[in-house]
């Protein structure tokens, strides 16, 4: 599905590790084994690569140098992007207790508030819905954009990262 979405938007796309046989889900591929994507992005000279888990509710990214962009990075990047555009309505990004301390320090430096929940996108969304927050997620790449969904969506996360790249 991701390739169809990106192709429809005019992106040049490559797909790797997309031949499921019923037994090989996430087998040395996807968001839990991102090394192959890192190598592929660098060797092909690509701008970005996106890795999804088996049900595509998680997304991690690889930049042009092969660096992994975790869910914490995505929350920071898109949280700042939203704030710059006046779309971070509560000025709060929702995270879990597993997020890196550096994320909170970076949010503090940008004047962005944050909330910590128990691990699980269920708890992240619960807090978001109760408090009117627009973005939240987990280090693992479950990113929730409450304007569009109540759970993580890897393809949506990819599109949002591309939006920032093209801004």
Q: How would you describe each model-predicted region?
A:
Residues 1-165:
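Phosphate-binding chemistry for phosphorylated carbohydrates and sugar-nucleotides
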């Amino acid at each position: 599905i991701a390739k169809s979405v990106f192709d429809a938007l005019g992106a040049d796309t490559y797909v790797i590790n997309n031949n499921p046989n019923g037994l090989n889900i996430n087998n040395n591929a996807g968001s839990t084994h991102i090394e192959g994507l890192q190598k592929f992005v660098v060797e092909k000279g690509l701008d970005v690569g996106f890795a999804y888990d088996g049900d595509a509710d998680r997304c991690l990214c690889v930049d042009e140098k092969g660096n992994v962009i975790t869910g914490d990075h995505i929350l920071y990047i898109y949280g700042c992007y939203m704030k710059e555009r006046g779309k971070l309505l509560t000025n709060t990004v929702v995270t879990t207790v597993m997020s890196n301390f550096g994320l909170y320090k970076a949010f503090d430096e940008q004047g962005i508030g944050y909330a910590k929940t128990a691990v699980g996108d269920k708890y992240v969304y619960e807090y978001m819905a109760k408090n009117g927050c627009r973005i939240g997620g987990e280090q693992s790449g479950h990113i929730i954009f409450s304007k569009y969904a109540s759970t993580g969506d890897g393809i949506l996360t990819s599109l949002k990262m591309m939006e920032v790249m093209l801004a």
